[in-house]
């Protein structure tokens, strides 16, 4: 009888965990979709050049980011990075951290690095966040993932944020599964942004 009771408790516990994980997966997947759709919208509005539309889209993006951060940071602070999530849910956690302010990026970067080392998220994701943190601190980046822009009278000029070791850049990018820098720059050129 004790074995059956223990077995039933174990089954109920596993079932509850699976349902809880599905619910968390669904929540995080919805956060991923909101994060990406607001960024796609701002990208198309940005190309239109209408300042009022750009400002409105930026405000909407900030509101979505704050909403997403409240949920994700609440989860991370309460229980750490949840195990057993689908890849899209794990990606959502990364994106929310990546799009946060510098203090939050620095706080959660160790978790991002750990999950990248475990293969839960891509090593390129951790490299991107590391570069973004360095750029925001005014330091040279390592992997060449970050760009910046300067407005001039004749338009906007984009450039690759300075890199710590340009001679080894492609080698470092390869270590974290990022494409060669020439391929990365070509992507920007395809989008009409000259680096």
Model regions and ranges:
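Bacterial Sec-dependent N-terminal signal peptides
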Residues: 1-23
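Mature-region segments of soluble proteins
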Residues: 105-182, 186-192
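Enrichment for repetitive, rod-forming helical segments
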Residues: 9-10, 41, 46, 180
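N-terminal helix-rich structural modules
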Residues: 20-144
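Low-complexity, intrinsically disordered/propeptide-like segments
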Residues: 9-13, 27-31, 181
């Amino acid at each position: 009888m004790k074995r059956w009771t223990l077995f039933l408790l174990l089954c109920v516990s596993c079932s509850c965990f699976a349902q809880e994980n599905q619910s968390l997966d669904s929540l995080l997947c919805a956060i991923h979709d909101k994060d990406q759709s607001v960024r796609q919208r701002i990208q198309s509005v940005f190309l239109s050049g209408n300042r009022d539309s750009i400002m409105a889209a930026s405000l909407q993006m900030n509101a979505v980011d704050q909403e997403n951060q409240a949920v994700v940071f609440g989860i991370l602070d309460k229980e750490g990075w949840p195990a057993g999530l689908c890849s899209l849910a794990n990606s959502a956690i990364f994106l929310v951290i990546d799009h946060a302010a510098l203090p939050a990026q620095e706080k959660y970067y160790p978790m991002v690095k750990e999950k990248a080392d475990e293969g839960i998220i891509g090593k390129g994701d951790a490299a991107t966040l590391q570069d973004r943190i360095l750029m925001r601190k005014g330091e040279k980046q390592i992997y060449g993932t970050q760009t910046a822009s300067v407005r001039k009278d004749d338009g906007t000029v984009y450039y690759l944020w300075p890199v710590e070791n340009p001679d080894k850049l492609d080698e470092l990018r390869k270590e974290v599964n990022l494409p060669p820098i020439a391929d990365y720059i070509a992507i920007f050129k395809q989008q009409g942004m000259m680096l």
